[in-house]
Amino acid sequence: MADDRKAALDAALKKIEKSYGKGSIMKLGEKIDQQISTIPSGSLALDVALGVGGYPRGRIIEVYGPESSGKTTVALHAIAEVQKNGGTAAFIDAEHALDPQYAQKLGVNIDELLLSQPDTGEQGLEIADALVSSGAVDIVVVDSVAALVPRAEIDGEMGDSHVGLQARLMSQALRKLSGSINKTKTIAIFINQIREKVGVMFGNPEITPGGRALKFYATIRLEVRRAEQLKQGTDIVGNRTKIKVVKNKVAPPFKIAEVDVMYGLGISQEGELLDMAVEKDIVDKSGAWYSYKEDRIGQGRENAKIYMANHPEMMAEVSALVRAAYGIGEEVAVPEDEKGQEELPLVEE
């Protein structure tokens, strides 16, 4: 009896593979690629918070938060990392607000970046689907879900009501996209805004536009919020930003990465490296002074950051120790053009 059942199952499996191709059905233990393949996020602190060393390939990621919190910056750093590793990136700019000069400063190769500025939400999502289905693009960023306006809304009058139209559009698109994203191992990052429900007395009134579909389909959801302003003297030079992993299907969620987002420069690698090195006792902090081995590297956090920026060899050494302490892969070597760069001035305390 058992042999008959096994023979029937084998026949069914062969029939399925013949109809839908090899790999369409298999035993879970036989799956070839069980190890999660990732790309770095561009932030060491965020790589640690994500739990797997970066963004998992073939998954959907949602990045949301208030205005000017650093959502697009987070996505552009991911694009820069993909390009550094020889991959192809696409940016669907539904907001029509991408600054190419800022993207370039973050390390994005704008000559190779595929850019689309769609007229309607349907057009933007169809372009995303075509790019993902090609299998030739490693990362697609949609900025933003809230700006994906359905065609009916654009063609209609200004005061017309279109209840649930955008939510239906996103639900339909994600049903179609999720399979091809997984099959082609493309990373899809959807940037989203936040809105507030009217009349909520208890609990969090904040919601994200585009319905619930994206929340369900996303493997990772990142909440990006400004914590405080960073100043040099009286000048505001950036923001201390908290990135909270509110959903994570590949590692434990609710971890927080704190980074410095500097105006015009993006995430400060020196700042996060310094904080992580202090946490793991690689760099010693005594009062206001920071020391590495026998050398004092700065009085105050800003001066220690500047010292690290001016000494890339030491920074690479600290980076290797921090990565080993957190169990993250090796960092790339320091570029030659950074070794001879002009030193930054220290900050007056």
UniProtKB/Swiss-Prot annotation:
UniProt keyword list: ATP-binding, Cytoplasm, DNA damage, DNA recombination, DNA repair, DNA-binding, Nucleotide-binding, SOS response
Keyword DNA damage in annotation: yes
SUPFAM superfamilies named among the record's database cross-references: P-loop containing nucleoside triphosphate hydrolases, RecA protein, C-terminal domain
SMART domains: AAA
Domain of life, source organism: Bacteria
One GO BP: SOS response
GO molecular function, one term: ATP hydrolysis activity
Signal peptide, first to last residue: none
UniProt binding sites for ATP: 65-72
GO cellular component, one term: cytosol
Annotated compartments: Cytoplasm
NCBIfam families in alphabetical order: tigrfam_recA (TIGR02012)
Similarity-based family: Belongs to the RecA family.
Function: Can catalyze the hydrolysis of ATP in the presence of single-stranded DNA, the ATP-dependent uptake of single-stranded DNA by duplex DNA, and the ATP-dependent hybridization of homologous single-stranded DNAs. It interacts with LexA causing its activation and leading to its autocatalytic cleavage.
Protein name: Protein RecA
